[in-house]
Amino acid sequence: MAGFSDIIGHEQIIGHLKNAIALDKVSHAYIFNGPKLSGKMMLAEAFAMALQCEGEGTRPCLLCRSCKQAVDHNQPDIIYVSHEKPNTIGVDDIRTQINNDIVIKPYSSRYKVYIVDEAEKMNQQAQNALLKTIEEPPAYAVILLLTTNADSFLPTILSRCITPVSYTHLRAHETCADL
């Protein structure tokens, strides 16, 4: 898991997320939309780690207990939502891993962050189950929906989530310049 400073490109998105943290204006739900392998998971993990960071100044600090736990994928308040079926995130996945869990306050952090990778695989029932939570979230909840196709979401989900910017693949000259 990397911090924001380890991510090449996506400066506008990183700036938006850092600004939300600095101004204490973190939304309850974000959609990270972009092509496969465009860095959505890396950015989501860096954002989740920054939200949980106990350090001062630039976050994530990568030195505090919470950051170290996040790097090891062992931070109890960063939850990766999984799914049993390979091509579908069903209503039971959302209910058991988000809706039933979100009522429990964070264990050791200010926020409880849920990362849903391949969120476009949520069927309509799963989206409707998630919608209720997105409409009335606890103050400590942040849900990150990572997708290659935001158009697959119900319009009501799209209207209640922040989409900082769509992700794109980096151009070769951007990557080479940073290497």
Regions found by a protein language model. Give the residues of each.
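Residues immediately C-terminal
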Residues: 121, 136, 152, 163
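Conserved catalytic/switch belt of AAA+ P-loop NTPases
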Residues: 128-139
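Loop/turn-to-beta-strand initiation segments
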Residues: 110-113, 139-143
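A short helix-turn-beta junction within AAA+ P-loop NTPase domains corresponding to the substrate/partner-engaging
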Residues: 156-166
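Single conserved hydrophobic/aromatic residue that forms the stacking wall/gate
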Residues: 169-172, 176-179
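Clamp-loader machinery-focused feature within the broader ASCE/P-loop NTPase space
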Residues: 2-125
